[in-house]
Amino acid sequence: MAMPEFTLRQLLEAGVHFGHHTRRWNPRMAPFIFGVRNQVHILDLQQTVPLLDRSLRAIRDVVAGGGRVLFVGTKRAAAEYVAESAQRCGQYYVNHRWLGGMLTNWKTITGSIKRLRQIDEMLAGDTTGLTKKEVLDITRDREKLERALGGIKDMGGLPDILFIIDTNKEKLAVEEANKLGIPVVAVLDSNSDPSGVTYPIPGNDDAIRAITMYCDLVASAVLDGISAEMIASGRDLGAAEELAPEILPEPEAEQATA
């Protein structure tokens, strides 16, 4: 594996440079704005390129050191891609709703995850002693917990870095990460507040093509970090038990399924 590559042209084609209408801007984003076109702020891709590369390397280095990455994106345009990308690289995600205390009150969240596991075991076992209504109520509880916690139920502890799409919507996630000293990588549109973001990526946070590109690049950086960690520890990639074959590099995936 190698660090993911991208070009300024690819960013342009994905619409990364398009900000919001000038009325909706956040003055703190002024240093990252190139100009105005048709009353829309244009983000400076000459800054985005090195900042995106820096962010990807930060994520890669965290993973290479054995760290966990939490993908966060609950807006409709991002939710699906956030989950898919995190799963593809064996990491974790929140794509439904950020619950208050998801990081700062991890002990309580762990209790809810335990409850989810208990329900899974209950429904997988013999339910003949329960009424249809009881089974239905339990199933609804499970669905609610799965939506909220399904992406972090196997995380096993606090993440080591966050990747966030839309810091306005995920303001609480940024605040909780800041309180705990967890670094934040985030896409910042022209209406975003860069405060509390360790690794800013100036770019459109609404266009599906742009969101898909960010998620794919971050997932690839994670996979490169996993490869680096395994090489450093002298392990054979093909013998890794924790990763699904589809997220291993092709030669190793073939060995894992052979």
UniProtKB/Swiss-Prot annotation:
SUPFAM superfamilies: Ribosomal protein S2. GO terms for biological process: translation. GO terms for cellular component: cytosolic small ribosomal subunit. The gene is rpsB. It comes from Granulibacter bethesdensis (strain ATCC BAA-1260 / CGDNIH1). Disulfide bonds: none annotated. GO terms for molecular function: structural constituent of ribosome. InterPro entries: Ribosomal_uS2 (IPR001865), Ribosomal_uS2_bac/mit/plastid (IPR005706), Ribosomal_uS2_CS (IPR018130), Ribosomal_uS2_flav_dom_sf (IPR023591). Transmembrane segments: none annotated. PANTHER family: 30S RIBOSOMAL PROTEIN S2 PROKARYOTIC AND ORGANELLAR, SMALL RIBOSOMAL SUBUNIT PROTEIN US2M. This is Small ribosomal subunit protein uS2.
